[in-house]
Amino acid sequence: MSNTGKLTPSKGLAITYLVRLSIGSPSGGRSEIENLNVIKKIREGFFDFPYASSQAMKRALRETLKGLGYKISPIVSTSPARTVGDPIQYIDDDLFGFMEAASKKSGRAEIDKFNGIRKAVVSMTPLLSLSAFDDNVDFGSNMMGLQAGGNPMPYETEVHRGWYRVSLYIDLNRIGTDAGFITEIKENKRADDINELIKNSLDEYDFIAEVPEDKDKNLKKGYATFKRICTNELSKKERYKRAKALLDSIRFLAPSGRNTNWLIDLTPKLMAAAYVKGARTPFLESPLLDDKQKDKNVINLAAIETSKETFADGIESLVVGYREDLIEKPNVQDNAINVQKMKAAFDTIDCWLKEHFEI
């Protein structure tokens, strides 16, 4: 069975950026030693590289959205705990998805089945260190025990410093629409000839195929499922506002959870961003900093140019943003890459969003 209909490429934002930690303790891992707070790490060869999970990073985005004044979905006390699953009212349910398989909001089983599970609009990697862990530990004491007449409880916390990398893909086509917004599902359509389906109302179909007839498996008939109808999807203006809110939360990203004990800055210091069609991860593995000039924090324009050429048919627009107080000013006179200061780069991305949502 194959889809023979016309495919429309998804449009989205692909963003890879670097964070600089002077000293910090990313999301915690499992420890077999009492009173030792360890960092999550992944091993390559003989070296361990600290990271913060993508779940922790999405939590930080949620908390930042809340700090920017957006209404966040409350937690429902069930097993397992979940959000209320209302993407119309709550921006995080729209952007980060939810699973509410037993939803009975509309009373129509087929619609509730699709609306009960929403795939995340935002795909995100963990925040991964570019340098290995060097066994640095901070020592402290829990002085609360003194108030109870006991002794201070000593503890240790693994700490790290260096450059970290994270990547996101934001499916702009699905913000404010799709699962969670569905109000009607048309019945499947059949025809004696698949060509009848292809030449009639093609844009209304989600899937078109040739399938065996129930009574005679040797006889093929046309079969089509209609696109699910979202009559209560958000307006283009509201969809733009949510995309812009997510962009702002990246720009002002603040830590959550245990990282509140270590005041760190998770905002982009060097960023490669692209408005893409289909190419979701053009810079995910690209070394944005030039390894040959690590002490100077030089942008690796050659690597970015290579990714740009590799995904040329999937990248519609590209911008590189940098913090001039941390990254050496690049020489782009003879380079076709659009390099801007960080604020200007985010303004450029905002222009892409306005164009996408026709604002």
List each model region and its residues.
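RNA-binding basic/glycine-rich loop and surface signature characteristic of RAMP-family CRISPR effectors
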Residues: 1-359
